[in-house]
Amino acid sequence: MANFPASLLILNGKSADNQPLREAITLLRDEGIQIHVRVTWEKGDAQRYVDEARRLGVETVIAGGGDGTINEVSTALIQIRDGVAPALGLLPLGTANDFATSAGIPEALDKALKLAIAGNAMEIDMAMVNDKTCFINMATGGFGTRITTETPEKLKAALGGVSYLIHGLMRMDTLTPDRCEIRGENFHWQGDALVIGIGNGRQAGGGQQLCPTALINDGLLQLRIFTGEELLPALFSTLTQSDDNPNIIDGASAWFDIHAPHEITFNLDGEPLSGQEFHIEVLPGALRCRLPPDCPLLR
């Protein structure tokens, strides 16, 4: 792999003392691969490190962390307007790793690193909310959002993605739907939603397949709404198929407009955004990402 160009790894501070990662990087450096490592400490670090990556001339910026880290790095990359932006590499080190998991990124650190450095760079979509905030994986609203934002950090650290399910079951007594209206291309729905998923990717909340048919290079966002009493399918990986369940509503569009009579909260790759009006649109081919050749999220 010695002929591959340099990469810069932006590592979430929580993983700074990851000894297996240190060993994997050392082995690759011994093979002649140049890998710069930068550790995030506060919001805005990812943007600064992407700027540094441009100055260094690296061809890949690797996001080492969970969905939030991937979001920060990818958002910084798509803001590059002059010249060709570095490709995005994925190194899943977070609690849930929903985007990387659904994209087929290897769990083994050495294999994930090699893919992030040497894999084929494919153009993929991102999404933007209210012309400001971006997400690469999914926007979720309703009860599921409250669970993912309220799950204690110690529980997530101990149990990983399963912690969301356990905390959700503990909070079943607080279950209330969000009334809203959603419009898209050839789509209109109004009612009470327990869970809303608008996906560029397929899963959120620690492995829940909220948008099981979503693709990251089709120029569309997938929508899934859970209504009525159908919370459990959202928590248990959608046990019932949407084609025979009237309480699961699906849609696809390049954009969605959401209006609510009261404030609701969406979780964008782990970051909450509250309001009553949301305009969500896809950004086709917004960045290049190094993915496995059999990535299930590609058409």
UniProtKB/Swiss-Prot annotation:
Which cofactors does this gene product need?
A: Mg(2+); Ca(2+)
Instruction: State its Enzyme Commission number(s).
Output: 2.7.1.-
Domain DAGKc, which positions? 2-133
Q: Which GO terms describe its molecular function?
A: ATP binding; lipid kinase activity; magnesium ion binding
> Where on this chain does Ca(2+) 1 bind?
125, 200, 215, 218, 220
Q: Which Pfam families match?
A: DAGK_cat, YegS_C
Annotated cofactor note: Binds 1 Mg(2+) ion per subunit. Ca(2+) may be able to substitute. 2 Ca(2+) ions are seen in the crystal structure; one of the two occupies the same site as Mg(2+) in other family members.
Cellular component terms (Gene Ontology): cytoplasm
Q: Which residues are noted in the entry as Ca(2+) 2-binding?
A: 242-243, 245, 248
- The source's domain of life comes to Bacteria
Keyword DNA-binding assigned to the entry: answer is no
Instruction: Tell me the residue numbers annotated for binding ATP.
Output: 40, 66-72, 95
Q: Which GO terms describe its biological process?
A: phospholipid biosynthetic process
Q: Which InterPro entries match?
A: ATP-NAD_kinase_N, Diacylglycerol/lipid_kinase, Diacylglycerol_kinase_cat_dom, Lip_kinase_YegS, Lipid_Phosphate_FormReg, NAD/diacylglycerol_kinase_sf, YegS/DAGK_C
Where's the active site on this chain? 271 (proton acceptor)
Q: Which UniProt keywords apply?
A: ATP-binding, Calcium, Kinase, Lipid biosynthesis, Lipid metabolism, Magnesium, Metal-binding, Nucleotide-binding, Phospholipid biosynthesis, Phospholipid metabolism, Transferase
Gene3D superfamilies on file: 2.60.200.40, Probable inorganic polyphosphate/atp-NAD kinase, domain 1
Assembly with partners or alone: Homodimer. May interact with the periplasmic chaperone Skp (also known as OmpH); this suggests the protein may be translocated to the periplasm and then sorted to the outer membrane.
Q: Which HAMAP family match?
A: YegS
Q: Tell me the protein family, please.
A: Belongs to the diacylglycerol/lipid kinase family. YegS lipid kinase subfamily.
Instruction: Show the PANTHER family listed in the entry.
Output: LIPID KINASE YEGS (PTHR12358:SF106), SPHINGOSINE KINASE (PTHR12358)
User: Its biological function?
Assistant: In vitro does not phosphorylate diacylglycerol, sphingosine, N,N-dimethylsphingosine; threo-dihydrosphingosine, erythro-dihydrosphingosine, C2 ceramide, C6 ceramide, phosphatidylinositol or dimethylsphingosine. The potential in vivo substrate is unknown.
Q: What is this protein called?
A: Probable lipid kinase YegS
Taxonomic source organism: Salmonella typhimurium (strain LT2 / SGSC1412 / ATCC 700720)
